[in-house]
Amino acid sequence: MEPFVEPEPQAEPQRVGYVLGLEPATTTEFRVLIDDDNYLQLDDLVVVSTQVPKAGEVRIYGVVTEVASRFEGGRFESDTLRIAEEGTMDADRTRSATVQTMRVVPEIWVAPDPGEVASRVAGKSRDEALYADEMARRLPVGFAKDGQPLWVDVDFFDGTKGAHLSISGVSGVATKTSFALAFLRLLTAHHALTPAGANLRALVFNVKGEDLLWLDKRNARITPEAREQWAILGVPAEPFPSVSFWAPVRQGPELIPDTESRMEGVSAFSWTPLEFIERGLLRFLFTETGDFRAQLTFIEERVRAQLIRNCEPDPRHPGVAIVEGTPIESLGDLVDLIELHVDPPDGEPEFAWTGRVAGGTGQAFMRRLHAAQARIGRLIRPGGRRVDRLAEAVCVVDIHKLSDFAQRFVVGAVLDEVFADKEATGQRHPLQVILLDELNKYAPREGHSPIKDTLIDIAQRGRSLGIILIGA
């Protein structure tokens, strides 16, 4: 792979205007009067050097957050016609930019003096504005509007100084997902996390369409300009070299992935009844915010404990569980067994399974289980195969055809496995990166759920465990 080669930057900053003096400039924001023969646009980086008594030169870096233009000399809106059309009033066109302070070097927080020259950053001043001069391990992740690369400090991603990545942007147009995948491609290609980076594993949940099932194929529509940009970033415009694809098993006796555009190279995933019980996956059937208030989670905890206590593997049939002498070969078998204890057709619910809850709560619990049987029943079967997250560098789990209920179950079950494995080993490396789109759906601000608890654990303890979350 070609090393990252940064384009040759301009040697010196280019003057674009002066700091306005008709209104106060502050330590956090100031305005620039733009020269007639120049321009500033949104997100441009600006530097102002100002002399501070007893401190010397202070460089103030900022980013353009707004650009405005006006006639200077008019007082009323109707003066626009007199100036522009009739020519009966004299006025000058002025353009100004609002700049928000990003960095001050040295860190003496003062406001820029009015009339100081404002320049567009370039070369070393650009590095200083973006803190790139302090990045020991900087990873190129894209380009700014000036055509120069932008970087992130890997130390703040991989757990050295911080962890996790949050991507914000417009929803529904796949821009956040596209950036997240490009980031993963650059991260794995540059091995920026060496020595651990070479063994990094990424888990990607595909929630929209089947586009991500083609990450190992070439882009037939890539342009020469895009190839050149990838080359500048130090990565060839090639697909991910190491990817595994997983999709939910299709309804029926065969282990066939439920996909449409691609079958080759896609594995079907499911869980055995024994895994479902022993790993306590029942709790991921109760992930709605109202379940906690309705005491459904209270019954679920007691039922889960009873199942684990009374469960043993069937020695003759791998994956089949035996609970109280009853073989459990499907989710339907398990629901029937639970119903005998929680909501029997004749008699009272067993205290060990339900505790002291109203009868209606037990009935609501069983209604949820019967609904779950129809939604995820095919995912619980003997001979099932769990997602193998470590087989390749990138693991794509396709859940876009599942209902919201089933998606929450799969995400919860897989994340729980990731967290449990990392806790068991106690080792940060190899790092496990998780890309989860629509993060707010799984961890809403209000309410409680097992998935939210798992994600909070990852956010709080993932840095020390080597689990890095990318949320979009």
Regions found by a protein language model. Name each.
Residues 133-162, 370-394:
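The Walker A/P-loop phosphate-binding site
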Residues 1-135:
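Long, basic/Gly/Ser/Thr-rich N-terminal segments
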Residues 202-203, 468-471:
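Short hydrophobic alpha-helical runs that function as membrane-insertion/retention elements
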Residues 41, 178-183, 409-417:
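Short amphipathic alpha-helical face segments that pack within enzyme cores
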Residues 42, 109, 150-151, 160-162, ...:
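Short helix/loop capping segments that flank catalytic or ligand/cofactor-binding pockets
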Residues 192-197, 204-205, 209-213, 239-460, ...:
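P-loop NTPase motor domains
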Residues 141-241:
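Glycine-rich phosphate-binding loop of nucleotide-binding enzymes
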Residues 165-167, 397, 470:
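Conserved beta-strand position immediately N-terminal to the Walker
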